[in-house]
């Protein structure tokens, strides 16, 4: 019995340690087991240096960050920030490059919790995250040039207006003029980006359009134990979802699909993502690289057919910038829902989230949905749990006889083991009989953990009374205390190990885990508390009502 219990505790403890180590690595802290790349300081607002008259050849994307004043001998044009507002965004477009330089997601606070508003794109001294485009293939307009707003009018989506269009015109460079138009649609996190290329020169031109996301490696919203993958990602039909670690870009060893005519590129962070989605069928090269200390970019380069003098070409793309809401992402582009990263348990986690979502649609509260899903999972696994608890009850029944044998043969381990094996055989007890049912449930346990950790729906979602945000820790630590109590009760239902050291360890484990759970999101702790309470009820029912424990005469 003590061997089985030790195995279970080791499995549980190692799972917790690995999860903790993953949290450490996911937001820049050193791993307990593996060396990590040195974390560099956040890039300054200006990003890499560059000049307004940068000449780029095919394949070279200028590295200067939008907002950096170009260094030229001639007076530089003055860039401006054009503010705009829709029902889902507040933002700013920098006329230097016509770059989307700031984007705040208004619906995350739902008008009632402004502290939950999330600024996705930003360009400050402490944080850089931009979406920008330009032309390659000659001395053509790029993100370092100052654009002019075209037909300046209302910059807010008002009344029954369904869409807001903002257009910006570049200066003529290399015989080319660019008109960039952003289209914001009511209720949508997808922004239309149209790049019109006019050949106003006297010779044909064959430019290449680049579309990229630029970001530093600074995580936002970083309470302990609540972050998943942070960094670039690429999706193609051939290689599917490919995450790119900043540390791999530091070492110039990132491995991902470099060319395609489908898919998208993205920057992913906890709960939110942005992605450039070029037109399906348009051939493009894909790149991801480090461009400055702690500043990175991922993007595509899409060639444009030759444009004759006096003619023009349009390159249309979509830019997603919003929350990782799985159902919404599925309708935007193939594979985009994968930015909501469940890791290696995706095959189990996705159906669990689907079920959680259905339950929420019925009860209207994510906290109660977690409770009901936990009850449902326990019901499904009841036969396995029953087998485990019956085995534990039988082991508990023969524990006094096991202790007597250990005492009798304590000087001869070989005879003691033989006597124990004979006892197991006579009583038809398998000392590991309770392990397998628990091991089978571990992937589901871990999957539900990642579902609750990765789901933006938990952000700002209340449960009852003092729990106002299931994605944050319990402000009064009530749930962690309840979890500690439930773990102690579970421990007391099991026989005391004969080894005093092991007995002390069994008493210490609930305290150790509870301290760690003090900093877990409330939604996760709620799941553990409900799971423990149901496990206690199951164990009591099975051992007391199904004859698992028999009274022995004194």
UniProtKB/Swiss-Prot annotation:
Transmembrane segments: 7-24, 362-382, 436-456, 475-495, 510-530
Pfam family, one: 60KD_IMP
Keywords assigned: Cell inner membrane, Cell membrane, Chaperone, Membrane, Protein transport, Transmembrane, Transmembrane helix, Transport
Localization, UniProt: Cell inner membrane
Biological process according to GO: protein insertion into membrane; protein transport
InterPro entries linked to this entry: Membr_insert_YidC, Membr_insert_YidC_N, YidC/ALB3/OXA1/COX18, YidC/Oxa/ALB_C, YidC_ALB_C, YidC_periplasmic_sf
Membrane topology: Multi-pass membrane protein
Any one of the GO CC terms: plasma membrane
Superkingdom assignment: Bacteria
Single annotated GO MF: membrane insertase activity
Family: Belongs to the OXA1/ALB3/YidC family. Type 1 subfamily.
Protein name (record): Membrane protein insertase YidC
Source organism (scientific name): Burkholderia ambifaria (strain MC40-6)
Organism classification: Bacteria, Pseudomonadati, Pseudomonadota, Betaproteobacteria, Burkholderiales
Gene: yidC
């Amino acid at each position: 019995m003590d061997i089985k219990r030790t195995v279970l505790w080791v499995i549980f403890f190692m799972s917790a340690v690995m999860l903790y180590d993953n949290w450490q690595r996911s937001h820049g802290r050193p791993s307990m087991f593996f060396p990590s790349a040195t974390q560099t300081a956040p890039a300054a607002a200006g990003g890499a240096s560059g000049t307004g008259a940068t000449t780029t050849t095919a394949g070279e994307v200028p590295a200067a960050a939008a907002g950096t004043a170009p260094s030229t001998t001639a007076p530089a044009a003055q860039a401006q920030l054009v503010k705009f507002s829709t029902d889902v965004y507040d933002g700013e477009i920098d006329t230097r490059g016509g770059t989307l330089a700031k984007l705040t997601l208004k619906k995350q606070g739902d008008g009632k919790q402004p502290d939950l508003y999330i600024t996705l794109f930003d360009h400050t001294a402490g944080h850089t995250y931009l979406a920008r485009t330009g032309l390659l293939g000659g001395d053509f307009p790029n993100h370092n040039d100052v654009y002019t707003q075209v037909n300046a009018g209302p910059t807010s989506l008002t009344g029954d207006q369904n869409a807001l269009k903002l257009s910006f015109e570049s200066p003529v460079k290399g015989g080319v003029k660019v008109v960039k138009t952003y289209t914001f649609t009511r209720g949508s996190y997808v922004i239309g980006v149209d790049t019109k290329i006019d050949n106003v020169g006297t010779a044909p031109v064959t430019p290449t359009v680049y579309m990229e996301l630029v970001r530093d490696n600074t995580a936002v919203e970083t309470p302990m134990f609540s972050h998943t993958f942070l960094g670039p990602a690429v999706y193609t039909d051939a290689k599917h979802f490919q995450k790119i670690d900043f540390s791999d870009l530091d070492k110039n060893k990132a491995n991902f699909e470099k060319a395609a005519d489908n898919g998208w590129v993205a920057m992913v962070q906890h709960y939110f993502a942005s992605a450039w989605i070029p037109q399906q069928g348009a051939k493009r090269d894909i790149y991801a690289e480090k461009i400055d200390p702690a500043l990175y970019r991922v993007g595509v380069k899409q060639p444009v057919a030759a444009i004759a003098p006096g003619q023009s070409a349009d390159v249309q793309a979509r830019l997603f910038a919003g929350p990782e809401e799985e159902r919404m992402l599925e309708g935007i582009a193939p594979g985009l829902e994968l930015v909501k990263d469940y890791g290696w348990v995706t095959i189990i986690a996705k159906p669990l989230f689907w079920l959680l979502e259905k339950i929420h649609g019925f009860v209207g509260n994510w906290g109660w949905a977690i409770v009901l899903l936990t009850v449902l999972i326990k019901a499904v696994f009841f036969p396995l749990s029953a087998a485990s608890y019956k085995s534990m009850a039988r082991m508990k029944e023969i524990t006094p006889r096991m202790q007597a044998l250990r005492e009798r043969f304590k000087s001869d381990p070989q005879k003691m083991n033989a006597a124990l094996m004979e006892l197991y055989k006579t009583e038809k007890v398998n000392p590991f009989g309770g392990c397998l049912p628990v091991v089978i449930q571990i992937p589901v346990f871990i999957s539900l953990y990642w579902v609750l950790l990765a789901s933006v729906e938990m952000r700002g979602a209340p449960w009852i009374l003092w729990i106002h945000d299931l994605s944050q820790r319990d402000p009064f630590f009530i749930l962690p205390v309840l979890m500690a109590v439930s773990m102690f009760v579970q421990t007391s239902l099991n026989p005391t190990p004969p080894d005093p050291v092991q007995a002390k360890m069994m008493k210490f484990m609930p305290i150790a885990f509870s301290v760690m759970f003090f900093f877990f999101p409330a939604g996760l702790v709620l799941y553990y508390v409900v799971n423990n309470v149901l496990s206690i009820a199951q164990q009591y029912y099975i051992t007391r009502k199904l004859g698992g424990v028999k009274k022995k005469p004194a």
